[in-house]
Amino acid sequence: MTKFKLEYIWLDGYTPVPNLRGKTQIKEFDEFPTLEQLPLWGFDGSSTMQAEGSSDCVLKPVAIYPDPARTNGALVMCEVMMPDGHAHASNARATILDDEDAWFGFEQEYFFYQNGRPLGFPEQGYPAPQPYYTGVGYSNVGDVAREIVEEHLDLCLAAGINHEGINAEVAKGQWEFQIFGKGSKKAADQIWMARYLLQRLTEKYGIDIEYHCKPLGDTDWNGSGMHCNFSTKYLREVGGKEYFEALMASSDKNLMDHIAVYGPDNDKRLTGKHETAPWNKFSYGVADRGASIRVPHSFIKNDYKGYLEDRRPNSQGDPYQIVRRF
């Protein structure tokens, strides 16, 4: 029997943005445990905005990954449950219509922050604009950011997370990683776990991750988004112009229902500037990064079949709520 370090990870009850929480227990197994072997666990919900008075909450394992940063470690994604077995009110994952044929690709943007400002920013004022997007060299990315993003990439791949790439973004200290998942819950689990690994990794560098969609306020710097590329089996295999137009009409009709779960303060980011569409107006266009929905050229050439990109979700959006809305 081998002792395994099981890191149980969950989302707390803070709003509008839940925080990642985690704690470790040691259990013995003959080999790396399966999801079915993992026990339920508890925590004090009064300390996470998830209970008052009778404060016991239950952690239900729903996904497991190897933890490459620990010997005999496992990362356990959990749903928060009530003691009677019902899903906690903060448990957005439990409300998802899980569809293994729904595919999601998330483009997670974020800032490295140190001493209250983006990594690489001067103590006063701002750096010169550009050429940071996909930049190379010390003057563009500094001396530590690339080390972190490369280590994060390796951690995700070693954990079995379908990490698909990295790049420096438009503002100094701003980066992006991409996660692709087949299945509504699987895709959302993996982006949350990738966020967890990034935040845990940067502890040793004395750096925080800032996910706010417009951390530099009303300035001429791009905000941070989490563009969501999505498709269903029908959209990939059948599609068609008539179906596409009906889908766009439905998206227009349900505009505010989508905006409500696409992350807080999106009105500060979705202004019609910096490659965004206004938050209160729906639009779509071929290869148009200033539209709500960007339609790839390949989609049109393939008889309106394939994937679409919703550019409205922001960097603080909850992937569980986003895939639920889709």
Curated annotation (Swiss-Prot):
User: One GO MF term, please?
Assistant: glutamine synthetase activity
- Quote the record's binding site residues for Mg(2+): E107, E109, E169, E176
Question: What are the inducing conditions?
Answer: Up-regulated by the nitrogen regulatory protein NtrC.
Q: How is its activity regulated?
A: Transferase activity is inhibited by NH(4)Cl.
What are the annotated GO cellular component locations? cytoplasm
Q: Which residues form the signal peptide?
A: none
Q: Which reaction does it catalyse?
A: L-glutamate + NH4(+) + ATP = L-glutamine + ADP + phosphate + H(+)
Recorded hits in InterPro entries, A to Z, give:
Gln_synt_N (IPR008147), Gln_synt_N_sf (IPR036651), Gln_synth/guanido_kin_cat_dom (IPR014746), Gln_synth_cat_dom (IPR008146), Gln_synth_gly_rich_site (IPR027303), Gln_synth_N_conserv_site (IPR027302), Glutamine_Synthetase (IPR050292)
Keywords, sorted A to Z = ATP-binding, Cytoplasm, Ligase, Magnesium, Metal-binding, Nitrogen fixation, Nucleotide-binding
The residues the record assigns to binding L-glutamate are: E275
Q: What is its EC number?
A: 6.3.1.2
Compartments where located: Cytoplasm
Sequence positions that bind ATP:
E164
What's a Pfam family this protein contains? Gln-synt_C
Q: Tell me which residues make up the GS catalytic domain.
A: 83-326
Coiled coil regions in record: none
Q: Which residues form the GS beta-grasp domain?
A: 4-85
An annotated GO BP: glutamine biosynthetic process
Q: Provide the cofactor list for this protein.
A: Mg(2+)
Instruction: Give the protein's biological function.
Output: Catalyzes the ATP-dependent biosynthesis of glutamine from glutamate and ammonia.
What family does the entry list?
A: Belongs to the glutamine synthetase family.
Additional detail: Two forms of glutamine synthetase (GSI and GSII) can be found in this nitrogen fixing bacteria, GSI is a typical prokaryotic glutamine synthetase whereas GSII is similar to the eukaryotic enzyme.
Subunit structure and binding partners: Homooctamer and homotetramer.
Query: Could you tell me what this protein is called?
Result: Glutamine synthetase
Please report the organism this UniProt entry assigns to the protein: Rhizobium leguminosarum bv. phaseoli
